[in-house]
Protein backbone atom coordinates (compact mmCIF):
# COMPACT_ATOMS: atom_id res chain seq x y z
CA UNK A 1 0.00 0.00 0.00
CA UNK A 2 1.28 3.45 -0.92
CA UNK A 3 1.05 6.20 1.69
CA UNK A 4 0.26 9.57 0.10
CA UNK A 5 0.18 12.74 2.19
CA UNK A 6 -1.34 16.05 1.13
CA UNK A 7 1.03 18.91 1.97
CA UNK A 8 0.84 22.68 1.61
CA UNK A 9 4.45 23.82 2.04
CA UNK A 10 8.06 22.68 2.09
CA UNK A 11 8.12 22.05 5.84
CA UNK A 12 5.13 19.71 5.74
CA UNK A 13 6.64 17.91 2.74
CA UNK A 14 9.82 17.30 4.74
CA UNK A 15 7.77 16.01 7.69
CA UNK A 16 5.82 13.69 5.40
CA UNK A 17 9.06 12.28 4.03
CA UNK A 18 10.52 11.83 7.51
CA UNK A 19 7.29 10.11 8.56
CA UNK A 20 7.56 7.50 5.83
CA UNK A 21 5.25 8.81 3.12
CA UNK A 22 5.77 7.30 -0.32
CA UNK A 23 4.29 10.18 -2.24
CA UNK A 24 3.05 13.71 -1.60
CA UNK A 25 0.34 15.77 -3.19
CA UNK A 26 1.34 19.42 -3.08
CA UNK A 27 -1.45 22.00 -2.94
CA UNK A 28 -2.12 25.54 -1.78
CA UNK A 29 -5.20 27.07 -0.10
CA UNK A 30 -6.52 24.22 2.05
CA UNK A 31 -9.66 26.21 2.93
CA UNK A 32 -10.53 26.28 -0.79
CA UNK A 33 -10.11 22.52 -1.09
CA UNK A 34 -6.65 22.85 -2.62
CA UNK A 35 -5.37 24.93 -5.51
CA UNK A 36 -2.18 25.06 -7.57
CA UNK A 37 0.82 26.01 -5.40
CA UNK A 38 3.34 28.63 -6.47
CA UNK A 39 6.15 27.53 -8.74
CA UNK A 40 8.66 28.56 -6.06
CA UNK A 41 7.07 26.18 -3.56
CA UNK A 42 6.98 23.37 -6.13
CA UNK A 43 10.66 23.91 -6.89
CA UNK A 44 11.57 24.06 -3.20
CA UNK A 45 9.76 20.82 -2.47
CA UNK A 46 11.30 19.07 -5.48
CA UNK A 47 14.79 20.13 -4.39
CA UNK A 48 14.28 18.90 -0.83
CA UNK A 49 12.33 15.65 -1.06
CA UNK A 50 13.15 12.44 -2.87
CA UNK A 51 9.70 10.82 -2.91
CA UNK A 52 7.15 11.14 -5.70
CA UNK A 53 5.73 14.65 -6.02
CA UNK A 54 2.25 15.17 -7.44
CA UNK A 55 1.03 18.76 -7.87
CA UNK A 56 -2.57 19.97 -7.72
CA UNK A 57 -3.63 21.71 -10.93
CA UNK A 58 -6.61 23.82 -9.89
CA UNK A 59 -6.60 27.53 -10.71
CA UNK A 60 -9.21 28.50 -8.11
CA UNK A 61 -11.52 27.17 -5.43
CA UNK A 62 -15.21 26.61 -5.97
CA UNK A 63 -16.63 24.32 -8.59
CA UNK A 64 -14.73 22.32 -11.18
CA UNK A 65 -16.28 23.98 -14.24
CA UNK A 66 -13.53 26.06 -15.80
CA UNK A 67 -13.74 28.83 -18.37
CA UNK A 68 -11.20 29.28 -21.16
CA UNK A 69 -8.96 31.50 -19.00
CA UNK A 70 -8.88 28.90 -16.22
CA UNK A 71 -8.18 26.14 -18.74
CA UNK A 72 -5.30 28.12 -20.26
CA UNK A 73 -3.82 28.58 -16.77
CA UNK A 74 -4.12 24.84 -16.11
CA UNK A 75 -2.22 24.02 -19.31
CA UNK A 76 0.57 26.45 -18.42
CA UNK A 77 0.72 25.13 -14.85
CA UNK A 78 1.19 21.60 -16.20
CA UNK A 79 4.02 22.85 -18.43
CA UNK A 80 5.73 24.40 -15.39
CA UNK A 81 5.28 21.24 -13.31
CA UNK A 82 7.02 19.30 -16.04
CA UNK A 83 9.91 21.79 -16.09
CA UNK A 84 10.17 21.52 -12.30
CA UNK A 85 10.39 17.69 -12.47
CA UNK A 86 7.11 16.83 -10.78
CA UNK A 87 6.26 13.14 -11.03
CA UNK A 88 2.58 13.77 -11.59
CA UNK A 89 -0.29 16.21 -11.59
CA UNK A 90 -3.74 16.08 -10.02
CA UNK A 91 -6.79 17.65 -11.68
CA UNK A 92 -10.38 17.21 -12.74
CA UNK A 93 -12.71 19.18 -14.98
CA UNK A 94 -16.49 19.02 -15.14
CA UNK A 95 -19.05 20.31 -17.61
CA UNK A 96 -21.80 22.66 -16.39
CA UNK A 97 -24.01 19.54 -16.27
CA UNK A 98 -21.69 17.98 -13.63
CA UNK A 99 -20.22 15.36 -15.98
CA UNK A 100 -16.53 14.78 -16.65
CA UNK A 101 -15.30 17.15 -19.35
CA UNK A 102 -13.71 14.35 -21.34
CA UNK A 103 -12.35 16.57 -24.11
CA UNK A 104 -10.52 18.95 -21.78
CA UNK A 105 -9.33 16.17 -19.46
CA UNK A 106 -7.92 14.30 -22.46
CA UNK A 107 -6.08 17.42 -23.61
CA UNK A 108 -4.50 17.93 -20.19
CA UNK A 109 -3.56 14.26 -19.85
CA UNK A 110 -1.81 14.35 -23.22
CA UNK A 111 -0.07 17.59 -22.31
CA UNK A 112 1.13 16.12 -18.99
CA UNK A 113 2.87 13.10 -20.51
CA UNK A 114 5.17 11.53 -19.39
CA UNK A 115 4.03 12.65 -15.92
CA UNK A 116 1.33 10.60 -14.24
CA UNK A 117 -2.17 12.00 -13.79
CA UNK A 118 -4.57 11.63 -10.90
CA UNK A 119 -8.27 12.44 -11.16
CA UNK A 120 -9.13 14.49 -8.07
CA UNK A 121 -12.23 15.59 -6.13
CA UNK A 122 -14.14 16.59 -9.26
CA UNK A 123 -14.63 12.85 -9.67
CA UNK A 124 -16.58 12.84 -6.37
CA UNK A 125 -19.13 15.45 -7.40
CA UNK A 126 -20.05 14.23 -10.86
CA UNK A 127 -23.67 13.52 -11.64
CA UNK A 128 -22.84 9.89 -12.43
CA UNK A 129 -19.84 8.38 -10.64
CA UNK A 130 -20.00 5.18 -12.70
CA UNK A 131 -19.88 7.14 -15.95
CA UNK A 132 -16.97 9.20 -14.63
CA UNK A 133 -15.13 6.02 -13.67
CA UNK A 134 -15.57 4.60 -17.17
CA UNK A 135 -14.24 7.82 -18.69
CA UNK A 136 -11.27 7.75 -16.33
CA UNK A 137 -10.23 4.37 -17.69
CA UNK A 138 -10.74 5.44 -21.31
CA UNK A 139 -8.65 8.54 -20.68
CA UNK A 140 -5.89 6.47 -19.03
CA UNK A 141 -5.86 8.63 -15.95
CA UNK A 142 -3.37 6.96 -13.59
CA UNK A 143 -5.67 6.79 -10.60
CA UNK A 144 -8.67 8.41 -8.92
CA UNK A 145 -8.22 10.34 -5.72
CA UNK A 146 -10.97 9.95 -3.17
CA UNK A 147 -10.54 11.61 0.20
CA UNK A 148 -11.32 9.34 3.17
CA UNK A 149 -14.25 11.51 4.23
CA UNK A 150 -15.76 11.77 0.77
CA UNK A 151 -19.49 12.38 1.21
CA UNK A 152 -20.47 10.91 -2.15
CA UNK A 153 -18.44 7.70 -2.26
CA UNK A 154 -17.95 5.79 0.97
CA UNK A 155 -15.10 3.29 1.32
CA UNK A 156 -17.69 0.50 1.13
CA UNK A 157 -19.27 2.05 -1.96
CA UNK A 158 -15.94 2.48 -3.67
CA UNK A 159 -15.49 -1.29 -3.76
CA UNK A 160 -18.18 -1.30 -6.46
CA UNK A 161 -15.57 0.21 -8.78
CA UNK A 162 -12.91 -2.42 -8.11
Which ranges hold each PLM region?
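Active-site-adjacent beta->alpha loops and helix N-cap segments on the catalytic face
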Residues: 10-14, 18, 30-54, 68-72, ...
